[in-house]
C-alpha cells in the first residue's frame, strides 16, 4: 500500500526548495507507460509553470495543501477562466478537458496538488507549450509571472 503522509509532503517541499524549478513531484504510478498517471506536485510560491496543454488527454487535479490560481487561455493567450484552488478556497479541484491551455500560479509558499491524467507519458508529446508563454529559462519570465498574477478573464497575457 502506498501511503500519503505529512512526511511525504515535507520531503517534496524540501526538494522543491532545493530545485532550480522550485518544485518537485512524486509519482504514484509505477512507470511512464501506465495508462493512468498519478502524481503529487509540490511548489514554492516562486515556481513558474509555463502555460501548456495536453493534446487529446484530460487532466484532473486537487490541491491538498496551500493554494494556486489556475488560469485557462484561448489559443492566443486571452484568459478564459481564473480560479483559486485549495483546501481553504471554494474550489478544491477541477478537471480540464483535452487541449486546454492552462497555467498554475502558486499563491502560498508550500503548496501541493495531486494530478491524475491519461497515460502513457511521452516526454515529446505530453505537453504542448503555449507559444506566447516564455520558456522557463527566458529573461521575460519574471514580468510574465507578474502579468499572470494580475490577469483577469478576457485579458491577454501574450
Residue ranges of each PLM-predicted region?
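Conserved hydrophobic/aromatic beta-strand scaffold that supports enzyme active sites
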Residues: 38-42, 60, 93-95, 115
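Conserved short histidine dyad/triad with adjacent acidic residue
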Residues: 40-56
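A short, N-terminal "cap"/entry segment at the start of jelly-roll beta-barrel domains
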Residues: 1-36, 81-87, 138-158
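Short beta-strand His + acidic residue motifs that chelate non-heme Fe in jelly-roll/DSBH
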Residues: 51, 70-72, 94-96, 102-107, ...
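Double-stranded beta-helix
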Residues: 78, 103-158
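Structural motif
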Residues: 47-48, 67-69, 110-112, 120
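Glycine- and acidic-residue-biased ligand/ion/polar-headgroup-sensing regions
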Residues: 56-76
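Short acidic-glycine-tyrosine-enriched beta hairpin
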Residues: 74-102
Amino acid at each position: 500500500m502506498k501511503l500519503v503522509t505529512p512526511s511525504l509532503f515535507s520531503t517534496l517541499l524540501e526538494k522543491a526548495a532545493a530545485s532550480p524549478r522550485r518544485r518537485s513531484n512524486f509519482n504514484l504510478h509505477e512507470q511512464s507507460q501506465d495508462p493512468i498517471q498519478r502524481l503529487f506536485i509540490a511548489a514554492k510560491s516562486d515556481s513558474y509553470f509555463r502555460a501548456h496543454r495536453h493534446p487529446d488527454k484530460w487532466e484532473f487535479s486537487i490541491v491538498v495543501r496551500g493554494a494556486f490560481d489556475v488560469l485557462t487561455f484561448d489559443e492566443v493567450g486571452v484568459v478564459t477562466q481564473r480560479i483559486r484552488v485549495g483546501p481553504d478556497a471554494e474550489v478544491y479541484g477541477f478537471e480540464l478537458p483535452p487541449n486546454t491551455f492552462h497555467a498554475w500560479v502558486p499563491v502560498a509558499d508550500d503548496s501541493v496538488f495531486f494530478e491524475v491524467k491519461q497515460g502513457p507519458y511521452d516526454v515529446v508529446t505530453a505537453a504542448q507549450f503555449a507559444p506566447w508563454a516564455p520558456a522557463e529559462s527566458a529573461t521575460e519570465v519574471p514580468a510574465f509571472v507578474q502579468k499572470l498574477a494580475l490577469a483577469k478573464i478576457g485579458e491577454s497575457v501574450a
